[in-house]
Amino acid sequence: MGRVSDFAKAWQAWHEAREAGLRATDGWLAISSIRWLGAEPERYADVPGEWSGSDATAIVTLAEGESLGDLGPGTHVLGPLDEDGVRLGFEGGIAEVAARPGGPIVRPRRAGAANLHAYVETPTYPADPGWVRAATYEDGRVVFEHVGGEHRLAAEVEDDGRLWVLFRDATSGVTTYAAMRQLLLPAPDAEGRTEIDFNRATNMPCAYTDFATCPVPPPGNTLPFAVEAGEKIPEFARL
């Protein structure tokens, strides 16, 4: 009983931290738009400045009285940018400026964003230790057993050694977000051993906003069974 209780408490603390992060005024729910920058300078209602850009470089011209982070009036070149980009604060929000394969973007986050105020919660399946699986990392794939069968999921190695997995399963589009969910696994040990905790399967940002750009699961990362663990489809109120 003590072990189950400790497991449930740890999961609950993780879930509450996850919800707090989603509700943050600099989080995914706070995004008010995504702007793809082109050669012609444009001004947008939800972020200061006149914007243009190409490839991995953005250009912003700020008028008198406008500022972004430490940038004041004048023309500023931001780049070369990567996918993480930079974040520049302004009165009432934050401007994320980043590179994408289609060119640079500016993506404002504002405390008054409609999605942030409409968000209710992300329901979950009950935490269940039975959805924790021993696994091994072999040739770019996480290998584990479920109901007597072996399954493999392609994984990417993060900078800190942990494994990032995008997957679909029989709940996708039914009780969980249709496109995919994600998992972050502990870094494998010297013999490749790790662990999958499906209770911590989370939604990608595109489950919360139309202004996110998300990858898709690799071919073969659709599990043939229902993973009744982790996050379900987010709930929003009608405003």
Feature annotation, model-predicted:
Residues E145-D189, N199:
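Acidic/His-leaning functional-site neighborhoods
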Residues P48-S54, G93-A99, H151-A155:
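Broad, structure-driven detector of short, well-ordered beta-strand segments within folded domains
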Residues H15, E19-P48:
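N-terminal beta-hairpin/loop module of FHA
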Residues R193, A201-L239:
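Extended, aromatic/histidine-rich regions of cofactor-dependent oxidoreductases associated
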Residues G89-E145:
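Surface-exposed beta-loop interaction hotspot
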Residues M1-K9, E16, L239:
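Actinobacteria-biased recognition of intrinsically disordered, low-complexity terminal regions
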Residues L37-D82, L185:
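Forkhead-associated
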